[in-house]
Every structure is written in structure tokens, then in C-alpha cells.
From Swiss-Prot:
The lineage of its organism: Bacteria, Bacillati, Mycoplasmatota, Mycoplasmoidales, Metamycoplasmataceae. The keyword Glycoprotein does not apply. Pathway: tRNA modification; N(7)-methylguanine-tRNA biosynthesis. It catalyses: guanosine(46) in tRNA + S-adenosyl-L-methionine = N(7)-methylguanosine(46) in tRNA + S-adenosyl-L-homocysteine. It is an enzyme of class 2 (transferase). The active site is at D106. S-adenosyl-L-methionine binds at E33, E58, D85, D106. Coiled coil: none annotated. Catalyzes the formation of N(7)-methylguanine at position 46 (m7G46) in tRNA. Pfam families: Methyltransf_4. This is tRNA (guanine-N(7)-)-methyltransferase. Its EC number is 2.1.1.33. Substrate binds at K110, D142, T180, T181, Y182, E183. GO terms for cellular component: tRNA methyltransferase complex.
């Protein structure tokens, strides 16, 4: 479904004091979600973990602005937004995070577009530079081929997969899983969600 353009989206995010100024300094209390969309999952994580800080990275202001309703619902003071493309993150963020989430990124299914996938080696280098030692990269996707590509890419580029499942909602970690808006849609259609955790070694 095409994202509806909201002309004043960036202004509305700024007015809520959610937009970070770059370069933004972080430390190991920070958790980052790349491609947060409407922010449902990360805002719930922020509410559940008030002693940690959360940064939602989203390329499109018209998607990110939707997170405002969750900020108000949970009265969050530990959640912020960065409007950025993933490839620019090392210029936008200074410091190292505890965890990076990749939630349902575009799988770019055509072979000629493989370098655009967020688990391609160039992006994995960025995440490695943004994570503390033993920091965790977490991936959720409904696309099996993309998941398999991601597993191979991680293994080939210095990462160790510490957990993986092809059925997140019937797995050991499901009890702590928070669904994204996109995830809820696919679960209702009985799609299986693939999930992994990895560290850079």
C-alpha cells in the first residue's frame, strides 16, 4: 500500500521535540530501530524500558509522524526520531548502541537490487560500527528468501547468529515479542515470521 504524503509531517515531528539534531550522540543505553515505520513496536519497547533510550530511524517523515500518537499514549520521554536513510547513519550518529532492530525491511526481491537489501555487506559494516562489543542485531521479516540471504550475508561478513527461527510466534522468544503494525497484518493472514539475533565477532 502506497504511503500517503503528509506535507507538514516533519514540522509536526519537530513540534513534539522528537526530532534529533545530527550528529546525535548515543551510548550503550540506546536501542535503534531502522525502518521503524509508524513506530508501534519501538514506542512500546520505550514504554516497557524507561531506563533505556530509543531512536527510531525512518526515511519517510509521513510514516514517522504516525508515531506521535504512541508518544502521547505512553507519555514517552525516552523516544526520539531520526529522518535518515540507513546508508547515512555513520554520519548522523556518533557513539555505539546496545541493540539494532531491522523490522520488515524491503526485501528487494529482484537479483539486480541485492545491494539495496539492509543485510547486504555494506550495511552490515555500518551496524558493526554502531554497536557496542557483543551488541545485538535483531531482524524480523516475512520474506523467507530475504531471510536466507541475510543469514548467508551475516555469516560471510564476520557475524555470529546466536538465535534464529522460521516461526517467531511459536518460538522461545515469542513471549517478549512486540508486533509491528506490518507484522500484525501478516500474522492475521497466517504468515510465518522469520527472526534472528546476531553479534559481530
Amino acid at each position: 500500500m502506497r504511503l500517503r504524503n503528509i506535507p507538514d509531517a516533519l514540522e509536526r515531528i519537530q513540534n513534539q521535540n522528537l526530532l534529533v539534531k545530527t550528529p546525535w550522540n548515543i551510548d550503550d543505553s540506546w536501542i535503534i530501530e531502522i525502518g521503524m515505520g509508524k513506530g508501534k513496536m519501538i514506542s512500546q519497547l520505550a514504554f516497557d524500558n524507561p531506563n533505556k533510550n530509543f531512536l527510531g530511524v525512518e526515511k519517510y517523515p509521513s510514516a514517522a509522524v504516525k508515531s506521535i500518537k504512541y508518544v502521547k499514549k505512553y507519555n514517552l520521554s525516552n523516544f526520539f526520531i531520526l529522518i535518515s536513510d540507513a546508508k547515512d547513519l555513520l554520519d548522523q550518529i556518533k557513539g555505539k548502541a546496545n541493540t539494532i532492530w531491522l523490522t520488515f525491511p524491503d526485501p528487494w526481491p529482484k537479483n539486480r537490487h541485492y545491494k539495496r537489501r539492509l543485510t547486504y555487506k555494506d550495511f552490515l559494516k555500518i551496524y558493526a560500527n554502531l554497536l557496542v562489543k557483543d551488541g545485538i542485531l535483531k531482524l524480523k521479516t516475512d520474506n523467507l528468501k530475504f531471510f536466507e540471504f541475510s543469514i548467508e550475508s551475516l555469516k560471510e561478513n564476520g557475524w555470529k547468529i546466536t538465535y534464529q527461527t522460521n516461526d517467531l510466534h511459536n518460538s522461545l522468544v515469542n513471549s517478549s515479542n512486540i508486533k509491528t503494525t506490518y507484522e500484525e497484518k501478516w500474522v492475521n493472514l497466517n504468515y510465518k515470521i522469520h527472526y534472528l539475533e546476531a553479534i559481530f565477532i
